[in-house]
């Protein structure tokens, strides 16, 4: 079996003809005419550089009121929702620049320009390397995530079920566990350490054609 991945900037609604078999999309999982299977990405982290954490300093939710908050323009209420959930006055916040890619937010946070609110799966490498830290320690679940989407008719294909099972395994297997046969054949595990450019934007679609 061979897989071909193509990156699109906007989500596909599957109500119109398309040239791919399935897509990995970021959102609420409710796209028209699509069968959506959740993969990863709901776990969310608040991140910044260690230098910014120590300089402000950042230790409590209230401390974020004096930090520049980096925003995703296609998830515009992320910070507001978090602040309201933590009893903070959003009118006192310093909402900073907006970006259309999580990868840009991550790079800005690493460079010390502000604090980002991002899917944890996208910053695992930076957290491990110490270029980003979680100043508040606590993570939380977002209603948004990455989903494998396809027209319902395609989901009955054996090749689709194989790829769906592989992706779900990649997103859930414990560190060091063996990936299934499709990965051993050379496809790799695209979600164990997701490349920022491949799935770092709210509306980005990573579409795949499958040949078996």
Regions picked out by a protein language model, each given a short descriptive name:
Residues 1-4, 87-96:
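A local structural motif
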Residues 32-69:
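Flexible hinge/capping segments at coil-to-helix
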Residues 91-134, 141-142, 156:
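Hydrophobic hinge/microswitch elements
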Residues 69-86:
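Secondary-structure junction motif
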Residues 18-23, 44, 109-115:
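Alpha-to-beta junction loops
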Residues 31-36, 40, 126-136:
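Ligand-binding "clamshell"
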Residues 121-125, 129, 139-212:
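C-terminal effector-binding regulatory domain of bacterial HTH transcription factors
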Residues 1-31, 181-195, 209-212:
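Central regulatory/effector-binding core of bacterial HTH transcription factors
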């Amino acid at each position: 079996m061979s897989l071909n991945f193509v990156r699109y900037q906007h989500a596909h609604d599957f109500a119109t003809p398309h040239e791919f078999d399935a897509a990995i999309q970021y959102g609420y999982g409710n796209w028209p005419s699509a069968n959506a299977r959740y993969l990863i990405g709901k776990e969310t982290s608040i991140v910044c550089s260690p230098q910014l954490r120590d300089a402000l300093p950042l230790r409590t939710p209230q401390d974020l009121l004096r930090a520049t908050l980096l925003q995703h323009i296609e998830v515009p209420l992320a910070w507001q929702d978090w602040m309201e959930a933590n009893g903070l006055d959003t009118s006192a916040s310093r909402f900073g620049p907006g970006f259309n890619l999580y990868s840009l937010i991550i790079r800005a946070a690493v460079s010390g320009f502000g604090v980002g609110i991002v899917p944890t799966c996208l910053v695992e490498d930076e957290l491990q390397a110490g270029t980003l830290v979680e100043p508040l320690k606590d993570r939380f679940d977002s209603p948004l995530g990455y989903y494998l989407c396809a027209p319902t008719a395609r989901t009955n294909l054996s090749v689709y079920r194989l790829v769906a099972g592989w992706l779900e395994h990649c997103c859930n297997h414990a560190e060091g566990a063996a990936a299934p046969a499709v990965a051993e054949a050379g496809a790799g595990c695209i979600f164990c350490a997701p490349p920022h450019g491949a799935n770092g934007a709210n509306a980005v679609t990573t579409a795949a054609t499958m040949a078996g």
